[in-house]
Amino acid sequence: MVLGKVKKIPVEEPRLTKEQKIERDLLIKKKVSKLANSIRIPPAIYQFRTVLSEHDTKKFVELFMKYRPENKQEKRIRLQSEDPKKGPKPILVKFGLKHVTNLIETKKAKLVLISASVDPIEVVIFLPTLCRKMGVSYAIVENSTLLGKLVNLKTTSCVCLCDVRPEDEGSFKEMLRTADAIFLDNYETHLSTWGGLPQKEADEKQ
């Protein structure tokens, strides 16, 4: 023991029950929501409030599910076959922030889905601007869990498709038009629209 140094007694934090954890999480969400509506939200962040409708999201997910990567069991079966690399290279959904960013920068990505529920949102805040710069179609969806299901993960921040099979080209072009009409064509509007406080109150606070 060092003279003059106070010995710290470890304090055990109380273990919360499942109900207490749910109550705590709800309280945090309420505080975040209250804060979000009491300050001005910059356009770069507020643009993530514009998401695909439930109907459009369902159509996008159905197409992306056709190109979902193989899971562990499917991979094991493939590797046990006589020639695992036999056949053409499969068209699959690409995921992972760095990988998707690289595909956008090289203009290989054709449609990017970005999650609006990423925390912190700063992780993906640059993606819409990057897509606009490179001329890549993008859409924002409400839930990162939904995107995770497309690639056999719990959650993921973004996914993209670089190509589709000939039989899906018609529906894919329709989805590109839908995504562009909501996001790419309205990029300037989204990047000039502030959120949070009503405009009058925000101007008064300034």
UniProtKB/Swiss-Prot annotation:
Q: Which InterPro entries does the record cross-reference, listed alphabetically?
A: eL8/uL1-like, Ribosomal_eL30-like_sf, Ribosomal_eL8/eL30/eS12/Gad45, Ribosomal_eL8/Nhp2, Ribosomal_eL8_euk
Q: Keywords assigned by UniProt?
A: Cytoplasm, Ribonucleoprotein, Ribosomal protein
Quote the Pfam families the UniProt record gives: Ribosomal_L7Ae
Where is it localised?
A: Cytoplasm
What does UniProt give as GO cellular component?
cytoplasm; ribonucleoprotein complex; ribosome
Answer yes or no on keyword Cell wall biogenesis/degradation: no
> Where does the source fall among the domains of life?
Eukaryota
Write out the GO MF terms: RNA binding
Subunit comment for this entry?
Component of the large ribosomal subunit.
Q: Which family does it belong to?
A: Belongs to the eukaryotic ribosomal protein eL8 family.
Report the protein name in the record. Large ribosomal subunit protein eL8
Q: Which organism is it from?
A: Encephalitozoon cuniculi (strain GB-M1)
Organism lineage string: Eukaryota, Fungi, Fungi incertae sedis, Microsporidia, Unikaryonidae
* Gene that specifies this protein: RPL7A
